Amino acid sequence: MATILVDVVSAEASIFSGQAKFVALPGESGELGILPGHTPLITRIQPGAVRIEKEDGGEEFVFVAGGILEVQPQHVTVLADTAIRGTDLDEAKASEAKRAAEEMLQNQSSDLDLARAQSELAVAAAQLAAIARLRRKK
């Protein structure tokens, strides 16, 4: 079966690099599915789970806090603002971040505070959703 090279990188590290049969990730307008031979594309991605169906049939999950996706017919590159392997996600930490962002929303004093709180809340909620999705796969 045809495969596509997938690289998921953040400013800190390369999180995943390998051959895959399929990649699904959160785009601006909804979930994107990428197969080998996909039309070239550059777009922003939203906070959420990147699901990589590997060549051997296994799956890899990576949480991204947004970033840029570049697709070429035989290569997918995810340049993430922040990327965390699914196995390294911390539910307690994500829940606390969500609670703190909700509190910040209640106490915001400027448009900048509001935008920051909304952004942090979106990332925390997406991280919790990714954790729940990963649990369902186990």
Swiss-Prot record:
GO terms for cellular component: plasma membrane; proton-transporting ATP synthase complex. One of its GO terms (molecular function) is ATP binding. Keywords: ATP synthesis, Cell inner membrane, Cell membrane, CF(1), Hydrogen ion transport, Ion transport, Membrane, Transport. Its main location: membrane. It is found in: Cell inner membrane. The keyword Cell inner membrane applies. It is a peripheral membrane protein. Transmembrane segments: none annotated. HAMAP family: ATP_synth_epsil_bac. Belongs to the ATPase epsilon chain family. Produces ATP from ADP in the presence of a proton gradient across the membrane. F-type ATPases have 2 components, CF(1) - the catalytic core - and CF(0) - the membrane proton channel. CF(1) has five subunits: alpha(3), beta(3), gamma(1), delta(1), epsilon(1). CF(0) has three main subunits: a, b and c. This is ATP synthase epsilon chain.
